[in-house]
């Protein structure tokens, strides 16, 4: 593709011969590889993509970073292939390209949690066909070292946050004789078929709800709708108004449990919640193995 000299900035990507086009100004940025770094005109672009194009003048179209489609997207976030049928319809939506472009831009200017490899970690613990219970959260913990891609859960070596402490108290209320580990890592739940999914998958360090308008809720909502259509008979635990408004499963097809949020500020003490016991009783009536939460 021929390019004329233009005094304005030119965003260019990988040209056919593997180098930036010499006609580009010396101050331009490359959108290949997620838009990272500026290269001089004619310099070799080692992170380019052979199908990318040069876009003269101003900013490139809102197509998202180069890893936002198909296999490249799954590799960038270490997404398990079993979730591909549920995720790929969202990738075809132009709004997802804008979401990922903004996510990538923010990653270059601020600390975004959890780390990229953990944003979709929930896809790696169980397949869609193994999910039996869905617990909906809001957004990740915003302090470093806490969030690892599972709603409410923290890493094993991190102190248990207040909301999660109340969730564990509810488990103890359902199973008084259970011996609790006292840790807040819920990976065992996830491997056992509990989908712990926030409606917003990222957050700026130290700023709760800072990415709530980014578009993750639309993306996550689409994935949950496809999962619900594919798997009738799921148990949904919706805690608080946010979860109950964000995700609306059909109660004729699923067992929908609602309660106040486990925050210590809630009027109704979450420790009295009987959802875990109710969920297992429901699963047993359908000859489905109950979940193990202790």
UniProtKB/Swiss-Prot annotation:
One of its GO terms (biological process) is base-excision repair, AP site formation via deaminated base removal. Its main location: host cell. Keywords: DNA damage, DNA repair, Host nucleus, Hydrolase. One of its GO terms (cellular component) is host cell nucleus. Its EC number is 3.2.2.27. The active site is at 139 (proton acceptor). It is an enzyme of class 3 (hydrolase). SUPFAM superfamilies: Uracil-DNA glycosylase-like. Pfam families: UDG. It is found in: Host nucleus. The keyword DNA repair applies. It catalyses: Hydrolyzes single-stranded DNA or mismatched double-stranded DNA and polynucleotides, releasing free uracil. Excises uracil residues from the DNA which can arise as a result of misincorporation of dUMP residues by DNA polymerase or deamination of cytosines. Therefore may reduce deleterious uracil incorporation into the viral genome, particularly in terminally differentiated cells which lack DNA repair enzymes. HAMAP family: UDG (MF_00148). Belongs to the uracil-DNA glycosylase (UDG) superfamily. UNG family. This is Uracil-DNA glycosylase. It comes from Human herpesvirus 2 (strain 333) (HHV-2).
């Amino acid at each position: 593709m021929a390019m004329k000299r233009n005094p304005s900035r030119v965003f260019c990507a990988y040209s056919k011969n593997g180098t930036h086009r010499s006609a580009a100004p010396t101050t331009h940025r490359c959108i290949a590889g997620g838009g990272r770094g500026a290269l001089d005109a004619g310099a070799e672009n080692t992170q380019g993509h052979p199908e990318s194009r040069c876009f003269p003048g101003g900013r490139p179209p809102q197509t998202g970073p180069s890893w936002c489609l198909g296999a490249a997207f799954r590799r960038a976030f270490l997404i398990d292939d079993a979730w591909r049928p549920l995720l790929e319809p969202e990738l075809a939506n132009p709004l997802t390209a804008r979401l990922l472009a903004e996510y990538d831009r923010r990653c270059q200017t601020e600390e975004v949690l959890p780390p990229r490899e953990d944003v979709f970690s929930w896809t790696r613990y169980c397949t869609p066909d193994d999910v039996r219970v869905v617990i909906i959260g809001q957004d990740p913990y915003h302090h470093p070292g806490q969030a690892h891609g599972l709603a409410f859960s923290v890493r094993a070596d991190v102190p248990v946050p207040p909301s999660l402490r109340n969730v564990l108290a509810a488990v103890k209320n359902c199973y008084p004789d259970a011996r609790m580990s006292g840790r807040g890592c819920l990976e065992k739940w996830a491997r056992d078929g509990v989908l712990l999914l926030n409606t917003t998958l990222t957050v700026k360090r130290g700023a709760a709800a800072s990415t709530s308008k980014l578009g993750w809720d639309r993306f996550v909502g689409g994935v949950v709708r496809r999962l619900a259509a594919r798997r009738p008979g799921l148990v949904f635990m919706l805690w608080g108004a946010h979860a109950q408004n964000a995700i609306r499963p059909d109660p004729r097809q699923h067992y929908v449990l609602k309660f106040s949020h486990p925050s210590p500020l809630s009027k109704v003490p979450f420790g009295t919640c009987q959802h875990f016991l109710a969920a297992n009783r429901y699963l047993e009536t359908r000859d489905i193995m109950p979940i193990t939460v202790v």
